[in-house]
Amino acid sequence: MNGIINLKKEAGMTSHDAVFKLRKILGTKKIGHGGTLDPDVVGVLPIAVGKATRMVEFMQDEGKIYEGEITLGYSTKTEDASGEVVAETPVLSLLDEKLVDEAIASLTGPITQIPPMYSAVKVNGRKLYEYARAGQEVERPERQVTIYQFERTSPISYDGQLARFTFRVKCSKGTYIRTLSVDLGEKLGYAAHMSHLTRTSAAGLQLEDALALEEIAEKVEAGQLDFLHPLEIGTGDLVKVFLSPEEATEVRFGRFIELDQTDKELAAFEDDKLLAILEKRGNLYKPRKVFS
């Protein structure tokens, strides 16, 4: 069994939980996911099965799209709605929506983020959330990410001394939307957190086409495997090249070939089928991963 699954992850489930359950449903151990989702986040979780597990790193490289809600008025340990409140700054007057939108615009393009303590980023061989649960604070390395689009998608609503609005973000891999929410709050002068989040697109897969675990289990029971997408969709943003029969033969034998290309990595096709991922070495391309 080989292919890519567009899984609709539910709230309360880790990405690892989803993989574990799919292994049981599909009866295979060779399964991985293309981009972690926090337990409280719902939406698209790309799943690679069989040969497609070799595509995971490229699936992760493609941009992701999220829709969610930001709450101004208090912040939490985890930077989302599940965490303990650590700071409060009551919203006592109506916010200027123009200033809010200007602050949002200032967080687009290449930006620097510091990963939250409650995250799976590793420092000195340990995940940050392990330090956090032990009550330890460690220095976290900055990381460069890109926010391609960040926009407010609703009027600002008010609930007591809190203000809320929904948003849409298109971003690069490694972006923490929780941290983006907190950083926006700081620019506006308020403690803030991400109060809801849905991933609507990842690895070229869309939420409206995603299937829940129960739906996949029903299809497997009925002998229907139409939920498995071909490996080709996992090539993400890689430039695609179509090889001649002679070039394809050379690639199958692991030999270098000459191509009129400049990109560091290429997705090489034979007819309509993904044959290999090629890596530039000097003026030639070497097969990095061969699929057939």
From Swiss-Prot:
GO molecular function: RNA binding; tRNA pseudouridine(55) synthase activity
Record: active site: D38 (nucleophile)
Record-linked InterPro entries: PsdUridine_synth_cat_dom_sf, PsdUridine_synth_N, tRNA_psdUridine_synth_TruB, TruB_C
Keyword Isomerase applies: yes
This protein's UniProt keywords: Isomerase, tRNA processing
Broad EC category: isomerase
Catalytic activity, EC: 5.4.99.25
GO biological process, one term: tRNA pseudouridine synthesis
Catalytic activity: uridine(55) in tRNA = pseudouridine(55) in tRNA
Purpose of the protein: Responsible for synthesis of pseudouridine from uracil-55 in the psi GC loop of transfer RNAs.
PANTHER family xrefs: PSEUDOURIDYLATE SYNTHASE TRUB1, TRNA-PSEUDOURIDINE SYNTHASE
The family this protein is said to belong to: Belongs to the pseudouridine synthase TruB family. Type 1 subfamily.
UniProt-recorded name of the protein: tRNA pseudouridine synthase B
Gene: truB
